From Swiss-Prot:
Chain residue ranges for the region called Disordered: 189-282
Gene transcribed to yield this protein: E2
One annotated GO biological process: viral DNA genome replication
Assembly, per entry: Binds DNA as homodimer. Interacts with protein E1; this interaction greatly increases E1 DNA-binding activity. Interacts with protein L1; this interaction enhances E2-dependent replication and transcription activation. Interacts with protein L2; this interaction inhibits E2 transcriptional activity but not DNA replication function E2. Interacts with protein E7; this interaction inhibits E7 oncogenic activity. Interacts with host TAF1; this interaction modulates E2-dependent transcriptional regulation. Interacts with host BRD4; this interaction mediates E2 transcriptional activation function.
Keyword Nucleotide-binding carried by entry: no
Places the protein is found: Host nucleus
Keyword tags: Activator, DNA replication, DNA-binding, Early protein, Host nucleus, Phosphoprotein, Repressor, Transcription, Transcription regulation
Entry-linked SUPFAM superfamilies: E2 regulatory, transactivation domain, Viral DNA-binding domain
Gene Ontology cellular component list: host cell nucleus
Role description: Plays a role in the initiation of viral DNA replication. A dimer of E2 interacts with a dimer of E1 in order to improve specificity of E1 DNA binding activity. Once the complex recognizes and binds DNA at specific sites, the E2 dimer is removed from DNA. E2 also regulates viral transcription through binding to the E2RE response element (5'-ACCNNNNNNGGT-3') present in multiple copies in the regulatory regions of the viral genome. Activates or represses transcription depending on E2RE's position with regards to proximal promoter elements including the TATA-box.
Name by which UniProt lists this protein: Regulatory protein E2
Annotated spans, DNA-binding domain: 298-385
Length: 385
């Protein structure tokens, strides 16, 4: 058991080092998938020995580890083949070589430079489907030689040239038969560039974290099925100001009133502790006493967003090297559903909370601890811990 734990720790340290390097080398991406395969093999072996948990990490069923190991092997074969092509020296990020990116349409091709295309089907203004137009598509010809083509948009659909043949990987007419009764469709927007990597932390591109699929949070995938028109807000729920909501503690379900601003500083009542809905500002008004009184309303937290296994690696490292700098860490979790604003929570990535005793402890933590660029970090607060 101890040897298994040491082996898993070593693999995860190597993976976390790769994420921190933010490498654009295809050789490093090949190494990344090799490490993922080894991790799944180790977990498969551990479950076969009846081990349910290694350290803080649950051991999945053997069928899960086996399937993910096979995916990692297949991914490695494609990347290693690309390594021997004329495109090997191009910049390749973890996003570009992710599993989800590889199997997205057109399937089993590498893709770069996604742009979103919204198409409305039928007569309903809200019956909109989002697709991705890939600027560069790398495919294998009949001789298994890698070639590069540019994605195209026309009235018929999204396509690329496979040699001398134009291949449509999205056919709008076929999609119209699926999503509408009239067969009508309308392309709503000219291609608008979507960054293939998004801001991470305070700056820098976002890369996927460590996941068994290797997809991470950076992939651009089409939004299948009818959806609400972008920018449209449902009228079922009233609009509420403030950057952060809170769950009620029973009763009528109405939001508790906000504490009214006062001309003088006074401590919060027991009913007001944890009652603020907006993040604290960094204003120094009121001095240290004012800051402490403000902190009494909301215990401070940090929210880490990224790939779930990458967050687990970070939690492991924090528990061993920075244990005294924070109060506690949560398990990883994801947004699973929501209304119009759900997409901004990036349901493809996981979240993990770090709790602190005070704002000052949180700032000291931020000054001393660094995170890989694949992980976004932002501040928040909770009613209680």
């Amino acid at each position: 058991m101890e040897k298994l734990s040491e082996a898993l720790d070593l693999l995860q340290e190597e993976l976390l080092s790769l994420y921190e390097q933010n490498s654009q080398s295809l050789a490093d991406q090949s190494r990344h998938w090799s490490l993922l395969r080894k991790e799944q093999v180790l977990l498969y072996y551990a479950r076969g020995k009846g081990i349910m948990r290694i350290g803080m990490q649950p051991v999945p069923p053997q069928s899960v580890s086996q399937a993910k190991a096979k995916q990692a092997i297949e991914q490695s074969l494609y990347i290693d083949s690309l390594l021997h092509s004329k495109y090997a020296n191009e910049p390749w990020t973890l996003c570009d070589t992710s599993r989800e990116r590889l199997v997205a349409e057109p399937a089993y091709t590498f893709k770069k430079g996604g742009k979103q295309i919204d198409v409305r089907y039928g007569d309903s203004e809200e019956n909109i489907v989002r697709y991705v137009l890939w600027l560069d598509i790398y495919y294998q010809d009949e001789f298994d030689t890698w070639e590069k083509a540019h994605g195209k948009l026309d009235h018929k659909g999204l396509s690329y040239m496979h040699g001398t043949q134009q291949v449509y990987y999205v056919d709008f007419e076929e999609e119209a038969n699926k999503y509408s009764e009239t067969g009508k469709y309308e392309i709503l927007n000219q291609p608008t560039t979507i960054p293939t990597t998004s801001a991470a932390g305070t700056s820098g591109p976002e890369l996927p974290g460590h996941s068994a699929s290797g997809s991470g949070a950076c992939s651009l995938t089409p939004r299948k099925g009818p959806s609400r028109r972008p920018g449209r807000r449902s009228s079922r729920f009233p609009r509420r100001s403030g950057g952060r909501g809170r769950l009620g503690r029973g009763g009528s379900g109405e939001l508790p009133p906000q504490p009214q601003p006062s001309s003088s500083w006074s401590p919060p009542s027991p009913q007001q502790v944890g009652s603020k809905h907006q993040l604290r500002t960094t204003s120094s008004a009121g001095g240290r006493l004012g800051r402490l009184l403000q902190e009494a309303y909301d215990p401070p937290v940090l929210v880490l967003a990224g790939d779930p296994n990458s967050l687990k690696c970070i939690r492991y490292r924090l528990s061993h090297k920075h244990r005294g700098l924070y109060l506690g860490a949560s398990t990883t979790w994801k947004w699973t559903s929501g209304g119009d604003g759900a997409s901004k929570h990036d349901r493809g990535s996981a979240r993990m909370l770090l709790a602190f005793l005070s704002d000052q402890q949180r700032e000291d933590f931020m000054d001393r601890v660094t995170f890989p660029k694949s992980v976004r970090v932002f501040r928040g607060g909770l009613d209680e811990l």
